[in-house]
C-alpha cells in the first residue's frame, strides 16, 4: 500500500507493530513550518499568559514530544534535554537505535539496530525541496472535505 501520510500517522502505524516506510521522493522532501504570532493588540495579563505559554512550548518538553513523532522542534537544544541519548541519536543524528525507541505514548516504534527513515536531521532538512503553507484554495478544500465527510 502506498499512502501519503504525515509523521504522526506513520508513528501510529509503527506503534501497532506494522512495517511502515517513509519513502522520500527523489525530488526531495515537502516540509511545513508552524509558529506563533501575537496580534499587536495583545496587552496586559493576556499578553503575559500568551508569552508564558510560548515560553513553556519552546522550553523542551513539547519539542521532545514532537521529535518522537518524527517532527522537529523549533528549538532543538531544549528538546534534547528531554530525550535520552539513544532517542536523540535515532531521531536527530540518523544513528541506529541501541534499544527500543518509543512513541510519545510509550508504544514501541523501533528496535535496537533500526535507523530512522531518511537519516539525520541535517540529511532530511537538507533535502527539503518545497516549503508548504496554507494554500489559497484551503477554505474551498476544507469545505469540500466536510461535505464529503457529512455525506
Where are the predicted features?
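Ligand-binding pocket segment of bilobal, Venus flytrap-like solute-binding proteins
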Residues: 1-23
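Soluble non-cytosolic domains of exported or imported proteins
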Residues: 4, 44-48, 132-139
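Solvent-exposed loop/turn segments at secondary-structure junctions
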Residues: 7-11, 28-30, 43-44, 60-61
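Solvent-exposed, polar/charged alpha-helical surfaces in well-ordered, non-transmembrane soluble domains
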Residues: 11, 51-55, 64, 139, ...
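Periplasmic-binding protein-like
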Residues: 17-40
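Mature extracytoplasmic/periplasmic domains
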Residues: 39-116
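Conserved C-terminal helix/tail region of periplasmic/extracytoplasmic solute-binding proteins
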Residues: 107-151
Amino acid at each position: 500500500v502506498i499512502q501519503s501520510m504525515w509523521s504522526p500517522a506513520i508513528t501510529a502505524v509503527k506503534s501497532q507493530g506494522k512495517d511502515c516506510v517513509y519513502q522520500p521522493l527523489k525530488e526531495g522532501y515537502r516540509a511545513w513550518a508552524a509558529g506563533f504570532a501575537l496580534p499587536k493588540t495583545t496587552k496586559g495579563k493576556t499578553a503575559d499568559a500568551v508569552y508564558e505559554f510560548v515560553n513553556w512550548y519552546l522550553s523542551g518538553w513539547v519539542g521532545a514530544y514532537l521529535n518522537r513523532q518524527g517532527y522537529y522542534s523549533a528549538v532543538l537544544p531544549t528538546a534534547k534535554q528531554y530525550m535520552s541519548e539513544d532517542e536523540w541519536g535515532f531521531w536527530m543524528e540518523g544513528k541506529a537505535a541501541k534499544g527500543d525507541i518509543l512513541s510519545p505514548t510509550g508504544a514501541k516504534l523501533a528496535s535496537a539496530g533500526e535507523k530512522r527513515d531518511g537519516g539525520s536531521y541535517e540529511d532530511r532538512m537538507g533535502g527539503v525541496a518545497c516549503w508548504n503553507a496554507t494554500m489559497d484554495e484551503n477554505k474551498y478544500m476544507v469545505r469540500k472535505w466536510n461535505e464529503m465527510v457529512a455525506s
